[in-house]
Every structure is written in structure tokens, then in C-alpha cells.
Regions:
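Secondary-structure transition motif
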Residues: 1-141
């Protein structure tokens, strides 16, 4: 299996982004350790607690520059249409929502995206920011 499963989260100590495997410490407390593939046998590893609200999973997808796309990222397509990436349990997949649709009461903003869409638009997708470092980008106007 070639699927990379990893997470990111902000350190509770210095707000640095940490990447790797997610470990549950106890109820509502999580830590990130280096990806299991990067751990050498016989070496000690660091475990760093992360803020629960900032944890996001790697989607397995990359943008046009080869940058990893994570849950919580804000992406744009051709410099337009800012969208948020989020895993939706009901659909059992990563979905997108137009930021402009998030506060509309009359619609459910999250849309499934076919695998072909990611392939067709890969050269047009750019990670603009994420909702944790730039919450102002998703505020209602």
C-alpha cells in the first residue's frame, strides 16, 4: 500500500507546525511523533503535544508545486474560488467547500470531489493558507 498517512498540528508550546504520526495521549490530548518511516531502530524519538483544534490529516494530494494538501488548508483554483479542505465522515472522504458558501443557511457547503477532478486541476491548485493561521479568511463579511 502506497498511501501516506500522516498528520500535522500546532505545538501547544510554541505554535510551530509539527508533522508525523498522531498519538492519543489521553482524552482530548494528542501528540505528533516523527513519521514511523523516519524512525531509526534503537534511537529515541520525541513526542510533541499539539493543539487538538489544529490537527489535520494529509489528504495524499499535492498542489502544482508539490506541496502537500492537508485538512484545514485553503486552496485556490486558478487564483480564484477559495475552498477549504475537510474530511467529512458522512461521505468518508476529503471534501471541499467554497468559503463564500460556509455561512449560507439554505445549503450544505461540503461537496465530494471525484478523484479525476484533483488530477485534472492539479496544475491549477495552490495552497493559499490554512484556517488556523489565517482564520480571518473564513470570517463572514
Amino acid at each position: 500500500m502506497n498511501r501516506t498517512i500522516k498528520f500535522r498540528g500546532k505545538s501547544i508550546y510554541d505554535e510551530e507546525w509539527l508533522y508525523g504520526s498522531l498519538i492519543k495521549i489521553e482524552k482530548d490530548r494528542y501528540a505528533v511523533i516523527p513519521s514511523l518511516n523516519d524512525i531509526e531502530i534503537g534511537k529515541s524519538i520525541g513526542m510533541y503535544e499539539v493543539c487538538l483544534e489544529t490537527i489535520g490529516q494529509f489528504t495524499g494530494l499535492y498542489n502544482r508545486n508539490g506541496e502537500e494538501i492537508y485538512e484545514g488548508d485553503i486552496i485556490s483554483v486558478n487564483g480564484k474560488y477559495p475552498k477549504i479542505v475537510k474530511y467529512i465522515d458522512e461521505y468518508a472522504c476529503f471534501c471541499l467547500a467554497n468559503i463564500s458558501d460556509l455561512n449560507k443557511k439554505w445549503m450544505y457547503p461540503w461537496q465530494q470531489v471525484s478523484p479525476g477532478w484533483w488530477i485534472d486541476h492539479k496544475q491549477e491548485i495552490r495552497v493559499v493558507a490554512n484556517i488556523y493561521d489565517h482564520p480571518e479568511l473564513i470570517k463572514e463579511e
